[in-house]
Amino acid sequence: MILGASLKIIAPTGQYDPTKLINWGINRWAFKPEFGYSQRWGYWVLDGYAGVWFYTTNNAFFDIPVPKPQTEAPVGSFEGHLSRDFKRNRLWVSLDGNFWVGGITSLNGIRNLESKQTSSRIGGTFSVPVSKHQSLKFSYSNGTYIRFGGNYQTVSAAWQYSWLGRPK
């Protein structure tokens, strides 16, 4: 069994124009403390993560004609993976799922209950080794329950390099 913790921080970077509703950048900080659990049973591995996104106030959200401070309530996130490891050749596959809830926004102190995010996705991942420290990873996911946004399918391919050795 492995227990872990992490803290993800997103700084207000990129180009932000308060006169536009949609921007390339963000005008607030975001923090996500997260706790994780991993347990192996032979060739099977179960991973689970729970975290909460916290956001600072955007004091210049779409400020036409005057600046409007926007706040967002925390967003809880849960993620899980059930993986099958093929040790002989370091190949693995997994069933992946996640769930988010929260994020009600307020503009000028007025809460918008319609902005609450509640969504989940399910998918799979396949990883094949290329060399001792490199692998190719392919994944697919689909929205399973979408209340607000996020109703899309994803397909991804990634090259992964690991500087660490394989756990025993």
Where are these regions (language model features)?
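Outer-membrane pore/translocation modules
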Residues: 1-71, 114
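Outer membrane beta-barrel transmembrane domains
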Residues: 65-168
